[in-house]
Amino acid sequence: MLLIHELERIMEQHTERLIRLAFYYVRDLQSAEDIVQDVYIKFYDNQQNYEERGELKAYLSKLVSNRSKDYLRSWTYRKIQVQQKIFPQQTVMRRDMLVQQDERTLIENAILALPFKQREVIIHFYFEEMPVIDIAELLTIPESTVKTRLRRGRELLKLQLQHVEWEVLLHE
């Protein structure tokens, strides 16, 4: 049984990364934070089911990925999508508050615009720094499928970002 200070240490180590992962799935910071909080509660309540044969980082990432997918299928998410279509200005203002207007924002937006399957593997590969074999295992798909989704995702990103004059390159 985990002690509270052990759980706090785990949360300090993983929370920021897990929120970022959830955000890339659900595209909303508040929902991402809620998802991570739910995952920690589930992890604490069901810790006897956790087998320490794998990495805790991968286990928590899997929980966040699954919970994010559940959220995307939920009625709550669909209701928010309808509200954002009715009140689009609020969505734009909220997003501007969350993300800085720099090259990273352009890349993040391009990633968020990717189809779900490509976005999912791009996030795990580049942001979670997971090798292809681990992504395949996490998503229960063949390695070749992961590689194909990575290649297609990169191609789509290249198309989306080819018109950008990168500030960092202009000052070299």
Protein language model annotation of sequence segments:
Residues 65-83, 100, 152:
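Arg/Lys-rich amphipathic alpha helix in sigma70-family domain 2
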Residues 121-125:
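A short pre-motif secondary-structure segment
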Residues 1-8, 79-82, 137-140, 154-172:
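C-terminal edge and immediately downstream basic/flexible tail or linker adjoining helix-turn-helix-like DNA-binding
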